């Protein structure tokens, strides 16, 4: 019997992008269901009753929540194509450290640029320093996993579609400050899995501009 795979998602979510990319890298066919985050479906509330958030990966009726956990699950469940995590225990731990860093540092700081009035400039400066730390880790490698596109790349690349948002509202230039990281992002976008998962930056800017108006930030 064929696997039934459903992804509850939202187009602009960098976390949903992670799961889309991982599934594409593994060539897993799935039913993509776009959620209305302001009118969540009964299926989403049933499958993720704790956080009530997307993305939710449903595999044969069983939910897997949180995007980094989903990447691991996908890698272990469909091991044949394109390994996403290193097999070496140390390299695996190292990759998990940086993915955790991205969630705790990049996401939290970047959100302040567009969602908190009066903190845009300060948060943008902090974000640049965080991205420079990631740029140092990348070094001269093709990907964060050397020659292999994988876990850390997937964890970070979705934020690239939001870079224009951070630049617009934070009044910074990520390309001039972190040119190596932007070059890495362009390499990632050459992969079909990434190109199809990431929305156009202008679409994200329009969405966030509308959200800011509704939140009374503009």
Curated annotation (Swiss-Prot):
Primary location class: cytoplasm
E.C. code: 2.5.1.18
Gene3D superfamilies, A to Z: 1.20.1050.10, Glutaredoxin (3.40.30.10)
The reaction(s) this protein catalyses: RX + glutathione = an S-substituted glutathione + a halide anion + H(+)
Post-translational modification Phosphothreonine, affected residues: 148
Family annotation (Pfam families): GST_C, GST_N
SUPFAM superfamilies according to UniProt: GST C-terminal domain-like (SSF47616), Thioredoxin-like (SSF52833)
Residue intervals of the GST N-terminal domain: 3-82
Chain residues that bind glutathione: 13-14, 39-40, 53-54, 66-67
Similarity field: Belongs to the GST superfamily. Tau family.
Name of the protein: Glutathione S-transferase U24
């Amino acid at each position: 019997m064929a696997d039934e795979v459903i992804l509850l998602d939202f187009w602009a979510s960098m976390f949903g992008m992670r799961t889309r990319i991982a599934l594409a890298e593994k060539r897993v066919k799935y039913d993509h269901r776009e959620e209305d985050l302001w009118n969540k479906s009964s299926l989403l509330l049933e499958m993720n009753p704790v956080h009530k958030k997307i993305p939710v990966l449903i595999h044969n009726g069983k939910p897997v929540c949180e995007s980094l956990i989903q990447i691991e699950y996908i890698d272990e469940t469909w091991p044949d194509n394109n390994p996403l995590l290193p097999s070496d225990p140390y390299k695996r731990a190292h990759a998990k450290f940086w993915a955790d860093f991205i969630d705790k540092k990049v996401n939290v700081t970047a959100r302040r640029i567009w969602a908190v009035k009066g903190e845009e400039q300060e948060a943008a400066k902090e974000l640049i320093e965080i991205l420079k730390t990631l740029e140092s880790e990348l070094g001269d490698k093709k990907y964060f996993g050397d020659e292999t596109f994988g876990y850390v790349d997937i964890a970070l690349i979705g934020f690239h579609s939001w870079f224009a948002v951070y630049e617009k509202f934070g009044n910074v230039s990520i390309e001039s400050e972190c040119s190596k990281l932007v070059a890495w992002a362009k390499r990632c976008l050459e992969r079909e899995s990434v190109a199809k998962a990431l929305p156009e930056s202008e679409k994200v800017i329009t969405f966030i501009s509308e959200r800011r108006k509704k939140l009374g930030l503009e």
